[in-house]
């Protein structure tokens, strides 16, 4: 149990989040995991600035329940952009808990759900719009699995707070 005990709780936007006993902190604020993903990650990403034929390269550090990437994927639904996606996560339980929750599943398009399910089952997804790989383990070591020359258009860094998890906030 890498993140300690995980307690599930509802948030005000109808999504759910988890509280980690190890870090004594919730994954999301009580206003809503889905709202937080859209406000802190998807909107600031300004994906419309990329040309339609551009392959979007994304790194999601501390993938957790998957809200941030799933919200991004849904925001791109129907666009011509392709994606190369990498995720890093230390604990398999958050994604499994998310995929066991009907409310969580109902937030997403069919293609986004398929990506999440594929990440849970085989740590990667491939579809007509791109491909993705999720590396399980400590993000600091998992970065070595990504080619050194790889650059990213977007990096989602969603670790616990620097006070609770300073190892993922060092320079």
List each language-model region with its residue ranges:
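Short C-terminal domain-edge/linker segments immediately following a structured domain
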Residues: 47-51, 115-121, 165
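Short beta-strand immediately N-terminal to the catalytic nucleophile in serine-hydrolase-like folds
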Residues: 59
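Conserved glycine-centered beta->alpha loop in an early N-terminal alpha/beta scaffold
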Residues: 62
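Glycine-rich SAM-binding Motif I of class I
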Residues: 65-70
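Active-site segment flanking the S-adenosylmethionine/decSAM binding pocket
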Residues: 131-171
